[in-house]
Amino acid sequence: IRYCCHDPIFLKNRKGEILLLFAKFLDTEVNFTTWCNGRDELWMRKTQDNGRTWLPAVPAGIQSGHASNDSVLLPDGTIVFASTSTELPEYYFGAVQIYRSHDDGESWEKGALLTADDGNRIREPAICLRPDGRLLLFTRTCPGTAGWGTAGNRSLPSYRAESLDGGLTCC
């Protein structure tokens, strides 16, 4: 069986291995009519030779949302990435969950869970590591009632969050 996969991101661990994290629809090859309805989960593949060969895909052990942009590797070896979250029914695909790995991507712990207080939904986060050690996170937004956005929406604010502790908390 083939599966429809989407939203891939690359992660690099302290051993130099490259991980490919992606969302995989579990019940159909092509799922355009039911896009992003919670029936997908995050899977991962790993290469130890800079992409020449890849180990088989395995579940990443993360049951929430879609990653959208690449990760950061902290000086202590912790991998951090942010994902659009499906955990909160009132913010379904409208919140951001930060994930952290201390064992080169073998397992993940949850960090901060972010929402907007003004009724907008935040999604598709991008995260970067500043030279001073701060993590900055930027998100796309859309109105809380618009799903993934609607024609005619001209411009909404882009939200920004900052973490001083590697993504455990954000402000």
Where are these regions (language model features)?
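Asp-box/BNR beta-propeller blade signature and adjacent active/binding-site loops
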Residues: I1-C171
